[in-house]
Amino acid sequence: MDKTQKGKFFEDKAVRYLESIGYKVLHKNYRSKYGEIDIIAETDNVIVFVEVKGRFTENFGSGEESITKKKIDKIVKTALQFIEENNLQGKDFRFDVVALKGNQIFHLENAFSLE
């Protein structure tokens, strides 16, 4: 499985998980000039920007450990563009991480903020 296939595998698994707990998936792999957001969803009237990290093993550390400050900056800028493009100013939003390790799913709500 190459990197693209692995990414799709973990993102599809994360989508199924989020939908199973009541999230409505609005967009997958949203791209802007700043970067990409894996999943954009909505729950309880909150827009949730989700970064998906997956590992089959922990040989190279956990998925959530691989989210750098630079990556967070790209996600935030991309999210702000999505909000503007879709006239969502004034809506509540947050940034989550869904980390998958083998068959385990870890959902970290409010993993980071705009600051």
Curated annotation (Swiss-Prot):
UniProt-listed InterPro entries: Restrct_endonuc-II-like, tRNA_endonuc-like_dom_sf, UPF0102_YraN-like
Protein name: UPF0102 protein SYO3AOP1_0546
PANTHER family: UPF0102 PROTEIN YRAN
Top-level division of the source organism's lineage: Bacteria
Upper lineage: Bacteria, Pseudomonadati, Aquificota, Aquificia, Aquificales
GO MF: nucleic acid binding
Pfam families: UPF0102 (PF02021)
Species: Sulfurihydrogenibium sp. (strain YO3AOP1)
Protein family according to the UniProt entry: Belongs to the UPF0102 family.
Bilayer-spanning residue ranges: none
